[in-house]
Amino acid sequence: MTYVLALTGGIATGKSTADQFFKNKNIPVVDCDQIAHDLMKPKNASWQAIKDNFGTEYLNSDQTINRKKLGQLVFSDPTALNKLNQLTHPLIFDKTIQKIKMYQDKDIVILDAPVYFESNLDKKKIANGVLVITLPEATQINRLKQRNNLTDEEAKMRIKSQMPLNKKAQMADFVIANTGTIEELENKLEQLLIKIKEEG
């Protein structure tokens, strides 16, 4: 049976580095953010839902979603964020299940789901185990500012839009603190894989 490991954490905590580590091990990664991104392309399901519910002012001239403008709205207005999530999360969930089923012949599949708990995927029993990657908030803010070219305030608002990392850690099966080098993170991930294979 395939072991589905949900990978979550906060923004800029090191999930992409973990993804790359697993891909290098030939372990398939189902990326919920990529699925969400694809569904937002013109004429796709999320695109239609956003256009119908938020209006054409959130579209660019080429009909793509103005992600920056939509982001500014939802990361500053919890009601708008909740509305967006209610529209898109069921669509993302259906596509995610389809993707996971494609890898039924694999021992392990990684489900990269940044908002795993926020979107109630834990209630749907979609994964066999949940890994949370944590990071001190000051480091998280600095990484996010550099990566996304955000102000201090914008970075803090994005972090606050997600469930606190310490709460996610309490709900997880495995917790890795990403406080060192990439090599140290990879060593911790390697140990986790060994543990899962031994228990599986």
From Swiss-Prot:
Catalytic activity entry: 3'-dephospho-CoA + ATP = ADP + CoA + H(+)
A single BP term in Gene Ontology: coenzyme A biosynthetic process
Species whose genome carries this gene: Lactobacillus acidophilus (strain ATCC 700396 / NCK56 / N2 / NCFM)
Cellular compartments annotated: Cytoplasm
CDD domains: DPCK
PANTHER family per UniProt: BIFUNCTIONAL COENZYME A SYNTHASE-RELATED (PTHR10695:SF46), DEPHOSPHO-COA KINASE-RELATED (PTHR10695)
One GO CC term on file: cytoplasm
Annotated ATP binding sites: 12-17
One GO molecular-function entry: dephospho-CoA kinase activity
Protein role: Catalyzes the phosphorylation of the 3'-hydroxyl group of dephosphocoenzyme A to form coenzyme A.
Pathway: Cofactor biosynthesis; coenzyme A biosynthesis; CoA from (R)-pantothenate: step 5/5
EC class: transferase
Protein name from the UniProt record: Dephospho-CoA kinase
Enzyme nomenclature, EC number: 2.7.1.24
Keyword Cell membrane: no
Lineage: Bacteria, Bacillati, Bacillota, Bacilli, Lactobacillales
InterPro entries (UniProt xref): Depp_CoAkinase, P-loop_NTPase
Keywords carried by this UniProt record: ATP-binding, Coenzyme A biosynthesis, Cytoplasm, Kinase, Nucleotide-binding, Transferase
Highest taxon listed in the record's lineage: Bacteria
Family, per entry: Belongs to the CoaE family.
UniProt keyword Nucleotide-binding, yes or no: yes
Domain DPCK, residue spans: 4-200
